[in-house]
């Protein structure tokens, strides 16, 4: 990391220091591993965006915030790739001013994107607070102004925090404490919102409040509980990675030992990459619609390719492969009609035999 009283890098290591302590070769190996993980993460996020755009597994307002949460990673990944390129090629030896401008742009982009990720959890919970306040109309009216309001508040805060961090306007302790407090506060607020919705839902069963709530309000409160429980399952990993990454960021900036600074920096970047890889997996696991689609695609791609194709045949061994679906449907219904007719004839014959037997018995008794 290169930092001074005027400018602070978030994810960059001074190559001169690396050469001095003779760590260039192991760091290049670690960077190669990070690049491989970033390629895997890119494919993972493309698939996650396919699920986000294909299936509406949550309210549209929460859906918009998740699109922003996942979308920032593409810009963060591109900027990190630029920094890694210059890290591999020893940017300190490049005297072209355009290289320096590109490094600064990548640094600003990555820092802003990471601050968006670090601040997202409380804003996801704020959306659930609005859903609780507007329980009667939240599903019908949508209230698209809510995510716009939250984003219009969050983005300036994240941009200002990133610029303040880079330009060293505040101490690293200020940034670290604020981010940790925001994330822990968001988790506590989620617990409170969940309990409020459960208490509100339980009050419906009492005779005292039975007629005070409409059917749409009851449905929305049930959806709030379901969504809050879903968010509670995934917020644990988000909280852990946010607090861990911020702690490493603080450790990196307060360490006086060059080796400790580099270890903290590398650990921070690897942890951010793992953070980006784990979060979509957890969301997919706890979202039933996404899980079913993932299982379906898994069977379609990996299992069916290893299974022998069996041709459909009639009871007489004739193949039933038809290029035209209309012909196939006609053959199916013709066979079905033939089977139904045969069963009806068998029942009719059986009934006729039974009737004949009864008549013969009657004649004997006479």
Swiss-Prot record:
Pfam families: Sre. One of its GO terms (biological process) is sensory perception of chemical stimulus. The gene is sre-6. The keyword Phosphoprotein does not apply. GO terms for cellular component: membrane. It is found in: Membrane. Signal peptide: none annotated. Belongs to the nematode receptor-like protein sre family. Its main location: membrane. The chain crosses the membrane at residues 33-53, 64-84, 111-131, 146-166, 172-192, 234-254, 266-286. Keywords: Membrane, Transmembrane, Transmembrane helix. It comes from Caenorhabditis elegans. This is Serpentine receptor class epsilon-6. It comes from the Eukaryota. It is a multi-pass membrane protein. Coiled coil: none annotated. Residues 344-366 are annotated as: Disordered.
């Amino acid at each position: 990391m290169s930092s001074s009283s005027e400018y602070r890098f978030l994810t960059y290591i001074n190559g001169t220091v690396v050469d001095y302590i003779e760590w260039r070769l192991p760091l290049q190996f670690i960077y190669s591993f990070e690049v491989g993980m970033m390629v895997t993460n890119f494919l993972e996020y493309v698939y996650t965006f396919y699920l986000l755009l294909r299936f509406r597994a949550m309210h549209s307002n929460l859906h918009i915030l998740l699109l922003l949460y996942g979308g920032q990673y593409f810009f963060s990944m591109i900027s990190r790739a630029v920094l890694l390129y210059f890290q591999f090629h020893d940017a300190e030896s490049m005297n072209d001013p355009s290289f320096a401008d590109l490094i600064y742009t990548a640094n600003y982009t990555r820092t802003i994107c990471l601050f968006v990720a670090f601040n997202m959890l409380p804003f996801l919970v704020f959306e659930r607070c609005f859903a609780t306040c507007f329980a009667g109309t939240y599903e019908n009216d949508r209230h698209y102004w809510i995510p716009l309001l939250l984003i219009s508040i969050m983005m300036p805060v994240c941009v200002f925090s990133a610029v303040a961090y880079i330009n060293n306007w505040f101490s690293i302790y200020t940034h670290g404490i604020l981010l940790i407090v925001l994330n822990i506060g968001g988790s506590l607020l989620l617990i409170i919102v969940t309990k409020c919705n459960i208490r509100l839902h339980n009050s419906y069963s009492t005779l005292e409040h039975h007629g005070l709530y409409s059917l749409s309000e009851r449905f929305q409160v049930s959806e709030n509980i379901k969504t809050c429980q879903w968010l509670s399952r995934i917020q644990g990993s988000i909280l852990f990675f946010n607090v861990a990454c911020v702690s490493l960021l603080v450790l990196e900036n307060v360490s006086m030992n060059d080796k400790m600074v580099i270890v903290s920096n590398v650990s921070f970047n690897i942890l951010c990459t793992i953070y980006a890889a784990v979060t979509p997996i957890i969301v997919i696991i706890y979202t039933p619609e996404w899980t079913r689609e993932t299982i379906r695609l898994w069977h379609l791609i990996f299992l069916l390719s290893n299974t022998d194709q069996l041709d459909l045949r009639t009871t007489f061994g004739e193949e039933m492969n038809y290029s035209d679906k209309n012909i196939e449907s006609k053959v199916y219904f013709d066979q079905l009609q033939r089977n139904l007719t045969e069963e009806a004839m068998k029942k009719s014959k059986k009934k006729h035999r039974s009737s004949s037997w009864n008549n013969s018995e009657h004649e004997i008794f006479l």
